[in-house]
């Protein structure tokens, strides 16, 4: 009978995590309850997905408030109702509008107005109710509403388990208003009676109004629905159908063959292309490739520079679509590391753009795929050690010198009366979400409206952003496109403009075959003169290039891999360098383990790359490439 449960996503108000809510609700004897956070739907998806694991059934909705003042509580009756709530909340958050005291017309939503702050009875619709708190029962008897039991439900706001929860809430409210705890108005805080009451306690309190118990139970039972968490919710298809997606993907891949390989069509390349297209068709990932292709095609039309990186470099199709500039056939990169039958979610393309161009790329995606179906991925900034000490110190009125001292030496706080409170509650609220922000690069492009799954808000970045993070998005079936920013790309663009201005030469930085053959480039690499080159300009990297005399692409790739912590700490980096510099050591290694050496001849039999794990598991363990990748992922 709890239709107004708050979690930590009632920002700077709620105290319990959703897991703690599940546990407390179950302990209190409830089977059904509703998660209705204040102006936030972040917990809704997880509540729908995980409640059954605790033996519970969860309804979801929103507690609509202007500041602390509750206007009404909405509970979704279906997926369509959740979308209505998300649309309503998003509109007000994006436009920074207060909520009216009267809810808009809904078709699939229950609305509960707090007793005493509701529209005239004659205006209440069949899905609208009046919510009564235990401390309002006496007021009911003195009003004309006593005869209208059909419209009464129990509105026991559930925010706390105990007094310590309430104290933490008071601190959060003071932090939110940037005021001293001693001066924070009581009317800007929740009541200490906003507890998770047990079923028996609620029945006892409302025993003289049995109809309200029946109405509340019925409302919750009629608000139960299932959401599909299994299928991919990304835009799919890209065209009108999956089959035409594949036809377009094949056509664009064949066009790319000429750009990448000239008039020749190497047999090995064609076999690899056929294999990849079959796997993409099988997993219905054609739309994912085509959206990335559309993005980089627009970038080229606008003269923007970009780099596709990550495991996407293992895909020949990505190379042919010019999403990446790495030839996976030349480097013997396995497509299975990027896509395989054991991976149901779309893979990640990490695409870097210049910081000057990224916003236009983002705007292009919103314009092309629709404002209602596109959103930036949200993320939560949480309370961490230093921020907690700072904020709690401020609400207790401590001078900044004391706050800094406690931040640097928490034990010193134990000898101060206020410091003890800070230590006590710092651990209590550590990890609580503080406020919503924007993921560094993620963009969601959905087949249906984003508000089927989440509300959105408008950060300073200027694009609608989801109220849930990437992990919840993935649980729902929404997988992000990564549009990143890399300042070095802007410098490359500027450099090429200067070259064209001074020398009249037009340089194609995506034509990597020419760069690989350039003798001056080779000399710069092996002499470690790589200042200004992304990733290979650090002192350690330049020293390594000099040691290896790396003057070709395979050596450069190896150098950029062995310097990573995992390889370098395991001793494989040192062994690779020794074998590279010492022919006798290479010969000895080949004699000792000829099969392993032959398998990884480019790295002298030393496991350097992620692909090497796949190779060894495949050739020595008898696993398929897809199974070997699953082993690699752990």
Feature names for model-found ranges:
Residues 1-2:
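Extreme N-terminal starter segment of soluble prokaryotic enzymes
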Residues 5-75, 79-256, 292-296, 305-308, ...:
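Mg2+-dependent phosphoryl-transfer active-site scaffold
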Residues 8-12, 27, 263, 279-287:
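Asp/Glu-centered strand-loop micro-motifs enriched in Gly/Pro and often flanked by an aromatic residue
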Residues 248-271:
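A contiguous, well-structured pocket-lining segment that forms one wall/lid of small-molecule binding clefts
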Residues 263-264, 276-284, 595-601, 632:
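Active-site flanking loop/helix segments enriched in acidic
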Residues 266-307:
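Helix-rich "cap/lid" substructures immediately adjacent to catalytic or cofactor-binding pockets
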């Amino acid at each position: 009978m709890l239709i107004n449960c708050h979690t930590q996503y009632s920002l700077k108000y709620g105290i319990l995590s959703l897991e703690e809510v599940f546990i407390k609700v179950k302990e209190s004897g409830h089977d059904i309850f509703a998660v209705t956070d204040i102006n936030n739907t972040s917990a809704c998806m997880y509540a729908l997905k995980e409640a059954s694991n605790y033996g519970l059934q969860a309804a979801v909705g929103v507690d609509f408030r202007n500041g602390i003042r509750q206007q009404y509580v909405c509970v979704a009756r279906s997926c369509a109702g959740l979308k209505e709530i998300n649309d309503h909340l998003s509109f007000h958050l994006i436009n920074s509008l207060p909520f009216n005291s009267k809810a808009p017309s809904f078709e699939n939503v229950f609305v509960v107005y707090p007793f005493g702050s509701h529209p005239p009875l004659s205006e209440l619709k069949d899905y609208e109710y009046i919510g009564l708190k235990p401390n309002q029962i006496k007021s009911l008897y003195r009003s004309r509403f006593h005869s209208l039991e059909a419209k009464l439900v129990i509105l026991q706001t559930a925010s706390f388990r105990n007094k310590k929860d309430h104290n933490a809430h008071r601190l959060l409210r003071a932090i939110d208003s940037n005021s001293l705890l001693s001066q924070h108005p009581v009317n800007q805080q929740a009541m200490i009676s906003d507890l998770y009451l047990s079923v028996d306690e609620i029945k006892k309190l409302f025993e003289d109004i049995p109809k309200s118990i029946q109405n509340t139970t019925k409302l919750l039972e009629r608000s139960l629905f299932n959401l599909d968490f299994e299928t991919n919710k990304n835009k799919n298809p890209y065209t009108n159908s999956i089959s035409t997606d594949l036809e377009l993907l094949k056509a664009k891949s064949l066009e790319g063959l000429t750009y990448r390989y000239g008039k020749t069509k190497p047999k090995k390349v064609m076999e690899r292309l056929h294999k990849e297209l079959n796997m993409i068709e099988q997993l219905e990932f054609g739309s994912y490739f085509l959206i990335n292709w559309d993005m980089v095609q627009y970038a080229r039309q606008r003269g923007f520079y970009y780099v596709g990186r990550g495991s996407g470099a293992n895909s020949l199709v990505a190379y042919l679509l010019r999403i990446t500039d790495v030839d996976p056939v030349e480097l013997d990169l396995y497509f299975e590391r990027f896509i395989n039958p054991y991976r149901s979610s779309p893979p990640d393309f990490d695409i870097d753009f210049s910081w000057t161009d990224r916003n236009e790329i983002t705007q292009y995606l919103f314009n092309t795929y629709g404002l209602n179906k596109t959103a930036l991925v949200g993320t939560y900034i949480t309370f961490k050690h230093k921020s907690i000490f700072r904020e709690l110190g401020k609400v207790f009125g401590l001078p900044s010198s004391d706050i800094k001292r406690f931040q640097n030496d928490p034990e010193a706080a134990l000898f101060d009366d206020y410091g003890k409170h800070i230590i006590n509650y710092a651990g209590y609220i550590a990890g609580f979400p503080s406020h919503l922000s924007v993921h560094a690069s993620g963009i969601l492009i959905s087949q249906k409206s984003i508000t089927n799954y989440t509300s959105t808000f408008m950060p300073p970045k200027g694009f609608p952003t989801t109220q849930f993070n990437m992990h919840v998005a993935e649980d729902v079936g929404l997988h992000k496109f990564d549009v990143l920013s890399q300042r070095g790309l802007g410098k490359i663009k500027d450099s090429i403009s200067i070259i064209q201005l001074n020398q009249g030469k037009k340089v194609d930085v995506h034509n990597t075959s020419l760069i690989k053959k350039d003798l001056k480039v080779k000399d710069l690499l092996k002499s470690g003169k790589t200042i200004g080159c992304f990733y290979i300009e650090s002192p350690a990297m330049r020293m390594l290039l000099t040691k290896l005399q790396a003057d070709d692409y395979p050596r450069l790739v190896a150098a950029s891999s062995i310097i990573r912590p995992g390889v370098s700490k395991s001793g494989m980096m040192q062994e690779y360098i020794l074998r590279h510099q010492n022919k006798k050591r290479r010969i000895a290694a080949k004699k000792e383990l000829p099969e392993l050496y032959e398998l990884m001849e480019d790295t002298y039999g030393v496991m350097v790359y992620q692909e090497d794990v796949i190779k060894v598991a495949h050739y020595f363990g008898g696993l398929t490439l897809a199974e070997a990748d699953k082993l690699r992922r752990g």
